[in-house]
Every structure is written in structure tokens, then in C-alpha cells.
Amino acid sequence: MFQVVYFQVFNQHIVIHLITQFKKIIHFLFKNYKWAKKMKAAGIKIIYSIPGLKVHAKIALIKRKEINRIQYYSVLATGNFNESTAKFYTDHILFTTQKNLVKEMELLFIFLAYRKKADQFPCLQFNHLLVAQFNLQQKFISLINREIENANKGIPGRIVIKLNNLEEKVLIQKLYDASNAGVQVQLIVRSICCLIPGVKNMSENITVTRIVDRNLEHGRIFIFHNNGNTEIYMGSADWMNRNIYRRIEVCFPIPDEKIKKQLTEIINIQLSDSVKAVSLNNVLENIPVIATNNPVQSQKMIC
């Protein structure tokens, strides 16, 4: 694997530097191999993903023997279980015994244990989890379409999405369709954003902001107004080609109203940030958000 870096020198020629990543890859391979050996020695079964299909989902299923019964616990997250990144990444974790999620987590782990591709399991269905390679993109399209249908009926439509990266063309086009239908779309995109906001007859109802502060914004949150019956999802998937088409990703619904309220409050604070936020204009320039009377620094308020 090579990283290609382009930069322009004083004589206006483009110089291409190939920077090898072999040492970095070898380091991680050796580290993973070392830990795999230790875990195997302790009696832990290791299942490797198949080549060409990265498992990017951040999930765990815990089976615990309790008094007179076996209890399952699902852990579903937006970020890695990593002691290093946990120091400066902001992420969210749902810890639940909700039976529908537990059941589908079991199905997903069974699928991963077979080490096959998704198209070899045409009968495997997920009705609650959103799993890339199975139903993730289709479900998000359906959720956007519902907001469009409501807007066409005169019912206010609203979508709020927080991502690291936004690149995948099909989902971007659906957001344009939503904007043209009158749906208010608010995006918080930390890094890559291929959607152009604020263009008349294309994206005039879409705003894009990003927050760069002490901690790296890493969570993925998806909020759909649904005529007042708000649905909220979180998960591991950015809207990029690699996440949608070449990885196993998991997004999951938030069933608890208290958690929904908490997440909505967090997102509203971030949308109000006037200290560390910038907005993207229709030529994708970062425009600082100017504080008015009461400046808001979202990370300080949330922490």
C-alpha cells in the first residue's frame, strides 16, 4: 500500500512523492498476530474476516450466566474499543438487553463466523439493525423518502445527520431530493464533504457545519423527524463508498425516549456552536460561525 502525496513547488511543476506504509502495516500485523496468539492460548476463539471485506462495525455481544438464566447484553458503538483513541475521540455507545437487537446481533456474528460474502446469504434479513452489504443504504433511502413524502403532503420534514465523511453519490442525491421537496436538512460533517449546500433548486434547504475542537468529533448520528415521531439511529458507518459497498458496518435504532432526548440535546448544542464551528458555503469554503450575544462552545457545554 502506498500513500500518494501531491504538492506544488515554486516552479509550478507537480511533484509526486510515494510514501511507503509498509512499516506501519507490518507493525499492526505483528501487533495483531501477537494478541491473537495470546488470546488463542487463553482459549479464545479468533475468527478472521475474509479478504476484501473489512469489518468496521463496532459491536459486542456478551453472554452472561446469571441466577437461573442466561442473559445477553448488546454493545453497539460509533467508535472503536480503543484505549488510545478514547482519550481524544468523542463517540457514543449503546449498552442494551433489547431482545430485537440481541437477536439480530447473534445473526450477524453467525454470518461473520461463516467467513462468506453477503450475497451468499440472500435469506439473511435484518429488520432492526442497519447492516452494510444487506440493508443499510436501502433503509437510509427509505427514511429520507418518508421525509420527502411528508413534505409533499405539507407536513414539516427535517433530517439531522452527523458524520465524519459524506461522499456516496446515491445518498447525497437523496438529500438533494429532500431539499427540493422542502425538507430541512442539517448536516454536521467533520471531514470530507462532497455535498454542496445552499444552491438554489438543488440544496437550498441544506446546511453543513463542522466542529474542530480539542476532541475529535467521531460519532455518527442520524435523526429523522417522522411527523413528530422522531427516529434516531447511531452507528459505525460514514456515507462513503468504502463504508456502503466494501465493509460490514452496523447502525442501530435508539428505542429509549430518554436517550433520544439526550442525543437531540447534544446535537442541538453542536448545531448552535459559535466558537469552534464553521459552516460550508456553496463553493465549499469554511466560513467561521460568528458568535452573537452568548457564544457557544459545544464540547465545553456537553462535557
Task: Label each residue range with its predicted role.
Residues 9-80, 84-85, 95, 100-102, ...:
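PLD/PLD-like phosphodiesterase catalytic module centered on the HKD motif
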Residues 87, 107-118:
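Prokaryote-biased recognition of long, low-complexity C-terminal linker/tail segments
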Residues 116-129, 154-156:
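Gly-rich Lys/Arg/Thr-decorated short loops/hinges at beta-loop-alpha junctions or inter-strand turns
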Residues 3-4, 8:
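Extreme N-terminal basic, low-complexity initiation segments
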